[in-house]
Amino acid sequence: MSQTEIEIATQPDCWQQAMALARQPDGPAAASLPRPGERVAVVGCGTSWFIAQAYAALRESGGHGETDAFPASEMPAGRAYDRVVALTRSGTTTEVLELLRRLRGHTPTTAVTAVPQSPVTGPADAMVLLDFADETSVIQTRFATTELVLLRAHLGEDLGHLPRQGHSALDEPLPAGVLEAEQFTFLGQGWAYGIAQEAALKMREAAGAWTEAYPVMEYRHGPISVTGPGRVAWWFGDPAALPSGLADDIARTGGQLVALGRDPLSGLVVVHRLAAALASARGMDPDNPRHLTRSVILA
């Protein structure tokens, strides 16, 4: 078993710890994460950007305050926010550090990271540490899902079902036919679109797979043209919530629809397993993905 697969398997336990951390009335999450009504920007790079998108959609749709998500390198200069939240596993990503330095003394900032005493502790005003979810793998799995569990729990979501679903996602067989598929299109709605994007990235990173991701209502506006025999359209959501007629449209292409009907975050665990399995089937090493390092540190 690869180190990546070992870390994938620990996710439900990490989620339990994140929920407990979010519930601490005097803990770092309560003290440092956005308060109701604050106008917030959430930033990150790679996986962290997609988790930022999911959190931003959840926070704003839940009535907690206007929330935007940006890649750290693309946050608009001069836009007013009450707080900026930076998601960074290693705390060393160049673009995140540069942004936090620019904001220092102007906008309150909070970093969510896995590494104590990392460089991000300097320019960030506050920090939430998830060291129990840190990873040695290059590819993020458990840290990304754990930070989103923390953020969701801080918003007041009841996530008691999630660890059970996570264990099921680890134990159940992969959907039939997916290991043989040549292409994957991941679909989500609302916050699950960020999860769809992260799923597509995991498959590219680990297995070099051809993957795409779209908001589900955009799928008919062109992307459905790549679906066909031997290709998968993967819906992160309740099968009953799939837009009317879309399952029939996918069937007419000859493609396979996967709709697992669980919380999108536990659905992402299934994709983690698929990515690692597909990498092995293709003779690739998920612990050593091509052209990637644990953190992007620019000279």
PLM region descriptions:
Residues 34-164, 170-171, 189, 233-261, ...:
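Glycine-rich phosphate-binding loops that contact phosphosugars or nucleotide phosphates
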Residues 7, 238-242, 262-270:
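Short amphipathic alpha-helical interaction segments
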Residues 124, 248-299:
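Phosphate-moiety recognition in structured ligand-binding domains
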Residues 71, 210-218, 256-264:
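A generic structural motif
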Residues 1, 50, 54-55, 198, ...:
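Conserved phosphate/anionic-ligand binding catalytic regions in large, soluble enzymes, centered on
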